[in-house]
Amino acid sequence: MDDISPSELKTILHSKRANLYYLQHCRVLVNGGRVEYVTDEGRHSHYWNIPIANTTSLLLGTGTSITQAAMRELARAGVLVGFCGGGGTPLFSANEVDVEVSWLTPQSEYRPTEYLQRWVGFWFDEEKRLVAARHFQRARLERIRHSWLEDRVLRDAGFAVDATALAVAVEDSARALEQAPNHEHLLTEEARLSKRLFKLAAQATRYGEFVRAKRGSGGDPANRFLDHGNYLAYGLAATATWVLGIPHGLAVLHGKTRRGGLVFDVADLIKDSLILPQAFLSAMRGDEEQDFRQACLDNLSRAQALDFMIDTLKDVAQRSTVSA
């Protein structure tokens, strides 16, 4: 059999890549031609390989550094790099402004333009952008219903949600979003549903009283896991938008002027359906962050979350003349 040179190997499609990394207190560098992260324990350094060809995004938290050579290799492999705070918290906080994640996207000049052209075809029209936002919310609701009621893995793990109460919450939200006259009402309804879902999840896992804390200020396990898991969703969302060549600033719901708003729009497609229940399950089990993170990654992979994000973006983008 003839040898195959590295240049002849096929690139793994982003939607089929298996890895998403969140790292803290380590150095990312190139060692022996491979991208690795290094952790120090006393006088010893441990080197861990990052399979960049099978990785979608890399989130760097507190105490991390990365070399220019590593950034070059990650960009070449199409891996998005995001800088965030520790434990899945905002990178910077200043008065009213939080920078959730500062993204460095691979600067390939060969990104597709088809979806960008279709996206801007409706984006400048307020009403069409509202219709697109409704489409995102419909997809979110269907994902919540499917995951919470039909995911056997969640059910076997002990997530015993009240099916009737969930159905009522989803139906109420569906009616409200169809009647929402503007983006502000849609955002209000999104927050209202999330509050109901938090209550249902707390009841399903017997967590007790729960209040969602903002900006990483929560001290209880469920709040910490929610913050951490949401950043994994941001990583996939940033990858999905970059793959299709749609800039992160072209949001349909989270504000035209909010930095990276489209990433939050896309992440919301799966946060409540996949991250939220796992946060409560892991909190009740007493999981460590690494255990929770792995459970989330398993959920995201099993549910083909990145495929779902990309397909939803395509569906909206292809409606150049979006109609209600």
From Swiss-Prot:
Coiled coil: none
GO molecular function, one term: identical protein binding
Activity regulation field: Inhibited by EDTA.
Keywords assigned: Antiviral defense, DNA-binding, Endonuclease, Hydrolase, Magnesium, Manganese, Metal-binding, Nuclease
InterPro entries referenced in this protein's UniProt entry, alphabetically: Cas1 (IPR050646), CRISPR-assoc_Cas1 (IPR002729), CRISPR-assoc_Cas1_C (IPR042206), CRISPR-assoc_Cas1_N (IPR042211), CRISPR-assoc_Cas1_YPEST-subtyp (IPR019857)
EC class name: hydrolase
One GO term of the biological process aspect: maintenance of CRISPR repeat elements
Cofactor: Mn(2+); Mg(2+)
UniProt-annotated binding residues for Mn(2+): 190, 254, 268
Cofactor remark from the record: Mn(2+) supports cleavage of ss- and dsDNA, while Mg(2+) only supports digestion of dsDNA in vitro.
E.C. numbers: 3.1.-.-
Subunit record text: Homodimer. This bacteria does not encode Cas2; Cas1 must interact with a different protein to insert spacers.
Function: CRISPR (clustered regularly interspaced short palindromic repeat), is an adaptive immune system that provides protection against mobile genetic elements (viruses, transposable elements and conjugative plasmids). CRISPR clusters contain sequences complementary to antecedent mobile elements and target invading nucleic acids. CRISPR clusters are transcribed and processed into CRISPR RNA (crRNA). Involved in the integration of spacer DNA into the CRISPR cassette. Acts as a ss- and dsDNA-specific endonuclease.
PANTHER family: CRISPR-ASSOCIATED ENDONUCLEASE CAS1, CRISPR-ASSOCIATED ENDONUCLEASE CAS1 1
HAMAP family according to UniProt: Cas1
Family per record: Belongs to the CRISPR-associated endonuclease Cas1 family.
Protein name (Swiss-Prot/TrEMBL): CRISPR-associated endonuclease Cas1
